[in-house]
Amino acid sequence: MKKLITLLLMFSFGFIQAQDKLISANFKKSIQKGVTVVEFNAPFNSANSYSDYKKLTHCDYYKVCIAGSPELKKKYKVYSVPTIIIFHNGYVERKYKGNIMLELDVTTNELQKAVDELYLDKF
């Protein structure tokens, strides 16, 4: 019984975590409407993953693992991680690349400003 509960908890946690991850199959649909912020990263760089995404408003936020989606890495020319791309109605509007230390130089305020400019564009 203890093993069953442990497995159920692990499955539930994994499902919740996976909801914000994109793969090629669901990528296009997820970026089609409104402002979407997508972080491209790799398992070896998870320590430098963008952590303040919950502070962003007026946008959807997703993650793409480049190891699991090499075709997206190629299509969007992701050469360093992390890379954040802001889409507006399916089109690339802004791109922020990780530096030589595999860290993002963009601040949450800068990301929010870019999101707000695109979001307000609909009015």
Label for each model-derived stretch:
Residues S46-S49, L72, R94-Y96:
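Extracytoplasmic/secreted cell-surface and envelope-processing proteins
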Residues L4-F13:
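Sec-dependent N-terminal signal peptides
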Residues Y76-H88:
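Structural micro-motif
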Residues I66-E71:
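N-terminal post-signal-peptidase region of extra-cytosolic proteins
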Residues K21-T57:
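Local sequence-structure signature of Cys/Sec-based thiol-disulfide redox active-site neighborhoods
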Residues Q17-K33, E110-F123:
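N-terminal leader/targeting and pre-domain segments
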Residues L56-V64:
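Active-site regions of enzymes building and remodeling cell-envelope glycoconjugates
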Residues I86-F123:
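Non-catalytic, surface beta->alpha helical segment in thiol-disulfide oxidoreductase systems
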